[in-house]
Amino acid sequence: MDALEVLKQRRAVRSFEDKPIPKNILEDIIDCGRLAPSANNVQPWHFVVVTDKETLKYISEKATYGKFIKDAAACVVVYCEKENIHHLEDGAAATENIILAAKAYGISSCWVAGYDRTYEKDINEYLNVPSNLRMISIIALGYSTQNPSPRNKKSLNDVLHWEKF
């Protein structure tokens, strides 16, 4: 699948097959996250990949809109060093790279907000996350049980402005 196809076909999926993702594919997906742009090339990110069913269940119980995480093959929790003033932007870029790399492998995903959520502290403690890191996102990964249709999006004419607004 070429890059533009990946961008245009990506959909948020919340229903997954009970099928593991091979470790080498997970590593390659994370490597794509590692290659994301970051302000001043600081690369402030760390990625926790979770495949253990009990841990996935724990995260799904804590994450407000992530109840489906328990059924995912894996989830990735993206962290950034919080003293970096651009940690949110950098972590979001890494998150999107992971989602797009997964799609290129035929793996579906759903980005669950993690930043400044009430559940961040509990999940951080459970995963033994150092205190200098801030949760940016949780990404559920797995092979979809569905083929979601494209959702309605604003037209290009509604959002594109040439030269001035």
Which role does the model predict for each range below?
Residues 1-165:
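Acidic, surface-exposed loops and disordered segments
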